[in-house]
């Protein structure tokens, strides 16, 4: 029989009493008054912060947006079907944040940065707030490095720089997503991290984009953030900020990033739905009063950082859909005023076979030639002027029956330049190929080629230069200048190829 020693027992009890610490955990708790349509009204939660995450009994997460005198209006990040009136809600004390790491490259995630591609969890090293303040004036420097899209019409006439925000705007089915995805494909080997944010799109469309990226090897440097049309409005509203937070992680490490928001019209509609259900007063087109701030605080996060912050950059390509070409609607005018230029895609051009359907006349880049290499500046200056004169002449020539020879020549040149701007989807061109193509057009070397033959002639010319005159590309890549030597090589290549091409016909 074991002897019980009272002194041992008392010493154990004494030690435990000494180790006892009084712990009081303060939890901010409320009660659900009403729930439905992705919105919950909660009584209590006196100390809750605006934008704080809330946790419901069933594990659903919400965000406190309306702090009223007698209740709190919260939006739910799920369907909330199991939340009942009278169930308790706990304030978490956290503002919405996401994990970030290099492991996100090549993955498809949702607005909470959780993987949805079935490839397992993503290891993360740190967290970033979904809503971070934009870099200040002192932290930035002016945009000066080109962000090549691989599309001649843009790189020559509406150049985009690293750290710029360029709006892509047009009706549905005019190729807006194609311009953005081609730009991402063209960043291969350029050491640029790309983030593609799909907001309220069909799941099939997102799958198609991801497949294109995978086939072309673009997923190695791309993150896709997707919230499809069946996702709760809250998540569609958050998705662009998640994309920006992921890009910021790389930007502050001194890397160059490109973010595509496809598209912000759907985000504004999701925000309008949330605001109206929260009973916030509606404004123009029933959007809430702060819809401008919704987009400005997102797009201001795109920047070219100064040397003290590592020279990183975030370039934003927001996409906005117009109805019947109406650029003066509320959301289009808002985003046009926030961005540094817009690329306008026209349904008429698209239907007449001009693709990409970029309306060069009303598209602008407010950064301009600062975002071009010298070689491109040297050849592209003439292109925009010639196309503008051609558009004007074409309008007049519809009424005139007999045109003089000079006018006929200018119209013929313009038709060939328009052909020169046409490109197949997912076939971006390198800078040296673009320089060669533009030089051929603006200097009249295409005038002897039939209009219908221009595209095949240029495709073959680019292949001919790569195989027979590789030194041309080397000069442009190394010096970034269209030197006399490069010009001589190019003229020789054009002459040789033209002779061979005309003999084939």
From Swiss-Prot:
InterPro entries: ATP_synth_asu-like_sf, ATP_synth_asu_C, ATP_synth_asu_C_sf, ATP_synth_F1_a_nt-bd_dom, ATP_synth_F1_asu, ATPase_a/bsu_AS, ATPase_F1/V1/A1_a/bsu_N, ATPase_F1/V1/A1_a/bsu_N_sf. It catalyses: ATP + H2O + 4 H(+)(in) = ADP + phosphate + 5 H(+)(out). ATP binds at residues 170-177. GO terms for molecular function: ADP binding; ATP binding; proton-transporting ATP synthase activity, rotational mechanism. GO terms for cellular component: chloroplast thylakoid membrane; proton-transporting ATP synthase complex. It is a peripheral membrane protein. It is found in: Plastid, Chloroplast thylakoid membrane. Gene3D superfamilies: 2.40.30.20, ATP synthase alpha/beta chain, C-terminal domain (1.20.150.20), P-loop containing nucleotide triphosphate hydrolases (3.40.50.300). Transmembrane segments: none annotated. Its EC number is 7.1.2.2. Pfam families: ATP-synt_ab (PF00006), ATP-synt_ab_C (PF00306), ATP-synt_ab_N (PF02874). HAMAP family: ATP_synth_alpha_bact. F-type ATPases have 2 components, CF(1) - the catalytic core - and CF(0) - the membrane proton channel. CF(1) has five subunits: alpha(3), beta(3), gamma(1), delta(1), epsilon(1). CF(0) has four main subunits: a, b, b' and c. Belongs to the ATPase alpha/beta chains family. Produces ATP from ADP in the presence of a proton gradient across the membrane. The alpha chain is a regulatory subunit. This is ATP synthase subunit alpha, chloroplastic. It comes from Zygnema circumcarinatum. The lineage of its organism: Eukaryota, Viridiplantae, Streptophyta, Zygnematophyceae, Zygnematophycidae.
């Amino acid at each position: 029989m074991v002897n019980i020693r009272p002194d041992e027992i008392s010493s154990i009890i004494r030690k435990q009493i000494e180790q006892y610490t009084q712990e009081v955990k303060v939890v901010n708790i409320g009660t659900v008054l009403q729930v439905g349509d992705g919105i919950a009204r909660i009584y209590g939660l006196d100390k809750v912060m605006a934008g704080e995450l809330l946790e419901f009994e069933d594990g659903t997460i919400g965000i406190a947006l309306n702090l009223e005198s007698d209740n709190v209006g919260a939006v739910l990040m799920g369907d909330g079907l199991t939340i009942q009136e009278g169930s308790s809600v706990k304030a978490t004390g956290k503002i919405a944040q996401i994990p970030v790491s290099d492991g996100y490259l090549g993955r498809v995630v949702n607005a909470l940065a959780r993987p949805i591609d079935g490839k397992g969890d993503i290891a993360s090293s740190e967290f970033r707030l979904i809503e971070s303040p934009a870099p200040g004036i002192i932290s930035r420097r002016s945009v000066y490095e080109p962000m090549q899209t691989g599309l001649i019409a843009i790189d020559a006439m509406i150049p985009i720089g690293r750290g710029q925000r360029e709006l892509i705007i047009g009706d549905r089915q005019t190729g807006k997503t194609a311009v953005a995805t081609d730009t991402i494909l063209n960043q291969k080997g350029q050491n640029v991290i790309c983030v593609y944010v799909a907001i309220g799109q069909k799941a099939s469309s997102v799958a198609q984009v991801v497949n294109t990226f995978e086939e072309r090897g673009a997923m190695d440097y791309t993150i896709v953030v997707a919230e499809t049309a069946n996702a709760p409005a809250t998540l569609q509203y958050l998705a662009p900020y998640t994309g920006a937070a992921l890009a910021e992680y790389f930007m502050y490490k001194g890397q160059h990033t490109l973010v595509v928001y496809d598209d912000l019209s759907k985000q504004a509609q999701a925000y309008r739905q949330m605001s109206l259900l929260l009973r916030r007063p509606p404004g123009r087109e029933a959007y809430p009063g702060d819809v401008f701030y919704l987009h400005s605080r997102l797009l201001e996060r795109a920047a070219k950082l100064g040397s003290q912050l590592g020279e990183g950059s975030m370039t934003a390509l927001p996409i906005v859909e117009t109805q019947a070409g109406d650029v003066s609607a509320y959301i289009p005018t808002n985003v046009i005023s926030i961005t540094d230029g817009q690329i306008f895609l026209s349904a008429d051009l698209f239907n007449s076979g001009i693709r990409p359907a970029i309306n060069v006349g009303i598209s602008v880049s407010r950064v301009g030639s600062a975002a071009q290499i010298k070689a491109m500046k040297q050849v592209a200056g003439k292109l925009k002027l010639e196309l503008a004169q051609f558009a004007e002449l074409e309008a007049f020539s519809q009424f005139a029956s007999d045109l003089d020879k000079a006018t006929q020549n200018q119209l013929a040149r313009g038709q060939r330049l328009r052909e020169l701007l046409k490109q197949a989807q997912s076939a971006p061109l390198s800078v040296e190929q673009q320089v060669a193509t533009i030089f051929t057009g603006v200097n009249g070397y295409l005038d002897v080629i039939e209009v219908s033959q221009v595209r095949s002639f240029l495709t073959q010319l680019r292949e001919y230069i790569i195989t027979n005159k590789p030194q041309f590309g080397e000069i442009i890549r190394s010096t970034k200048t269209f030197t006399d030597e490069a010009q001589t090589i190019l003229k020789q290549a054009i002459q040789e190829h033209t002779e061979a091409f005309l003999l084939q016909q």
